[in-house]
Amino acid sequence: LAGNIDESLILEDEDDTFLLFLTPVIERYLNTLRVKMSDHDKISNELKLESLWVNYQKQHEFNPNHNHFGLMSFVIWMKIPTDWREQHEIPFAKNSNHPVTSDFQFTYTDIIGHVQDYSIPMDSDKEGVMLLFPSRLRHQVYPFYNCDEQRISISGNIVRS
């Protein structure tokens, strides 16, 4: 785990149940981008869920900017006990010209070579949402504050078998 998170547990995908759920989603994603895995229309036989884990993030904990290995990665937010609107009102965040407290954020290089950020503000509306993205895309999770409940997320990496 790249993060500064105290509790993270490895999960097992028994009988490839989770991979079978993810495969059509990944196929749609890759087909939309017109990415060909092989000469076949379906990529079902080419995917493997390499790693699967759950993070229990407490206030002040964070995941610094990092990427993953493989083809695709994902995060599913299971519990988000904070609201970004309140988090962005914390004095040190409010006084910032770019508050990111509690956000999930991608970092990428745009078409003219400038490094850009894309933040996804976190609140309970994101519970149950899955975000699928290329594994090499750099991302980070900012800490949240003033909340004793845990933020719970499930993440994983998909590779070509």
PLM region descriptions:
Residues 1-46, 51-63, 100:
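Non-heme Fe(II)/2-oxoglutarate
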Residues 53-132, 142, 149-150:
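Catalytic core of non-heme Fe(II) oxygenases with the double-stranded beta-helix
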Residues 157-161:
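Double-stranded beta-helix
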